[in-house]
Amino acid sequence: MWNKGLSYSERHGLRNVGINKITNTKTGDTLNPDKNVSKHSLGLVFFPAFDWKISETHPERQERLLYTRDQIVEEGLLDIPNIREYNPIVADWDTIERVHVGAPDLESWVTEAHRVSAGGAIAAADAVMRGEVDRAFALVRPPGHHAMAMVHGIRGFCTINIEAVMIQHMRQKYGIKRVAVVDTDVHHGDGSQDVFYHDPDTLYISFHQDGRTLYPGTGFMDEFGGPQAIGGNIDIPLPPGTGDEGLMKVMRELVLPILEEFKPDIVINSAGQDNHFSDPLANMQVTAKGYAELVDLLQADIAVLEGGYSVQEALPYVNTGIILSMAGLDYSRVVEPAFDPVKYKQSQNVTTYIDDLIAKWKVQWANRHKMAEDERLGAGDVWSNHYNVYYDETGVQEERLEKVRMYEDKVGWHSVLSRGQYGPYGPQSVYAMFIPWQADDETRQDAIVEAKKAKAEGGASRYVVVDPLGKGQYEL
């Protein structure tokens, strides 16, 4: 069974610090492990969803993981002792509905493939939480990190947030509290940010290509967490051309120190792979070996595949490197045939930009408590925010009014009045009251009173309450 009593650093007393070298942080001894011996037991869950696609020519199509599966089998990774394969399960509607509210409903958008993809992440989590393996990697699709709590269709290839559904399952079944999600996809995970933005016990860290140059156009330093969770959202927008050197610098100098301070019970890697130099949708220069070293540094408990669309030139090699790294095996010989060390060398301008960005982030992180205090003083009893969300795959323009109940000493509810236009189901309006998973009876009752008040005032066709560790989702 998972040992919840140890901190992040304590649970990773053995921290990988380089290719084929392990340093014990308690003794300082450096070990040179046998390259054929897995240092960590690893569970693998595959769900390639060969029957699901957005279109025949879309990047998110059936054969996306075909070559990856072939590579893993040909390399004999499934024959290595301590690497076990698990079957995915079908995520149940109750768990999904404790995270998401759909317009007109979730059934209109969520297919069985989406439920099995989320179920693959859940199967990986179960394997770790039951103590059957040290770590697990869910190689599943469709992806999920652009899916927000409100769902008006597909956006950024995502419909439901598979990591969020997995974390909900872990909190509900195993009592996990403090969670860190480190998103290494090239696109900012605006959906994961949305789901966790008001939760001070979930740290979301995303380093991605600068949103001024890439979809979804978000993910900047001022997106620092909601008014009751300042410092809980860390967006690190990296310049096009960032390579292995830049990612390692961000990991060592910024991400790892923040994780040490946050002290999560568990670390999740949203393992997007479209930072790769060959990916057709982005402009970065990361290699398969760079991804493996990143995983080596992070020491995540669970990894869940997100993006990555260089189906033949990147994914087979990147996933091989990640598996070897998570298992504590040598990954030094994982090299893509198309790799050119001269062509894909990070420029000095990019390095200087990243140095400056890290310096700014260190100042902001150090000032987070003062920023949180100022935010609370300025918010009053109820904080509100008005903004729009666009669904690129379904053409829906969503308008949102969000409110957060501010308490001095606990996490309050947040509500969303969502109105969607131009979608296939016509205009949709939904009011959703999200009760925090940490809620006590007073908070829960306040939330229900507020939701009933909103219903009496009108303005939506549906009124929904989401109580993640209580009754689940229900209509008023």
Positions of predicted regions on the chain:
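Extended, non-core accessory segments
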Residues: M1-G18, I22
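HDAC/HDAC-like amidohydrolase catalytic core signature
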Residues: N24-L476
